[in-house]
UniProtKB/Swiss-Prot annotation:
A biological process term (GO) from this entry: DNA repair
Zn-finger segments (C4-type): 57-72
Entry keyword annotation includes Membrane: no
Name under which the protein is recorded: Recombination protein RecR
Record's signal peptide: none
Name of encoding gene: recR
UniProt record similarity statement: Belongs to the RecR family.
Keywords tagged on the record: DNA damage, DNA recombination, DNA repair, Metal-binding, Zinc, Zinc-finger
Record lineage: Bacteria, Bacillati, Bacillota, Bacilli, Bacillales
GO molecular function term, any single one: DNA binding
NCBIfam families: recR (TIGR00615)
Keyword field contains Transcription regulation: no
Species, as recorded: Staphylococcus saprophyticus subsp. saprophyticus (strain ATCC 15305 / DSM 20229 / NCIMB 8711 / NCTC 7292 / S-41)
Length: 198
């Protein structure tokens, strides 16, 4: 179907978001058309502000308004423990449980040869540099319990073992194939308390 160019561009833009197909993108585009102009301007500003005002922490890779992030700046944190997660949503899930008091390292993905994503395409090199520079005693691998997460955890474990740092994995109880961000706080808390050495 042929749409006016502004609608077509908006549909194409919405389709760049994960999980948004052509029908959903079309529905969203027409919803925007029906919105009040002030709401549309506010929505567009929020999109632009996210890109302009947020950056990634130079230490851990977590999203932040200031560098380093509030977690890396917190002197009360246990700097001898780093929890490695796949993305920012995992940090937020871990912080909600209020049990973990160490630092984080965000990979921004996982190793997935089928998708052409190798170790050099995610935040692994900066993790290794960080481990050489800091007094880290334990590295907790909190990858999602799926094939990509397991592959990433095994790869990091093999890289880190020779450095002499204890590498642990979250305890099972997280459903295989699930995402860490969707685990409830009790399950996540038990997984961190029952972590095992790799």
């Amino acid at each position: 179907m042929h749409y006016p160019e502004p609608i077509s561009k908006l549909i194409d833009s919405f389709m760049k978001l994960p999980g948004i197909g052509p029908k959903t993108a079309q529905r969203l585009a027409f919803h925007v058309l029906d919105m009040k102009e002030d709401d549309v301007v506010q929505f567009a500003k929020a999109l632009v502000d996210v890109k302009r005002e947020l950056t990634y922490c130079s230490e851990c890779g977590h999203i932040t308004e200031q560098d380093p992030c509030y977690i890396c700046q917190d002197k009360q944190r246990d700097r001898s423990v780093i929890c490695v997660v796949e993305d920012d949503k995992d940090v937020i899930a871990m912080e909600k449980m209020r049990e973990y008091k160490g630092l984080y390292h965000v990979l921004h993905g996982s190793i997935s040869p089928m998708d052409g994503i190798g170790p050099e395409d995610i935040n692994i090199p900066s993790l290794i540099n960080r481990l050489k520079d800091e007094e880290v005693k334990e590295l907790i691998l909190a990858m999602n319990p799926n094939l990509e997460g397991e592959s990433t955890a095994m790869y990091i474990s093999r890289l880190v073992k020779p450095i002499g740092i204890t590498v642990t994995r979250l305890a099972q109880g997280l459903s295989v194939g699930g995402d860490l961000e969707y685990a409830d706080e009790v399950t996540l808390s038990k997984a961190i308390m029952g972590r095992t050495e790799m």
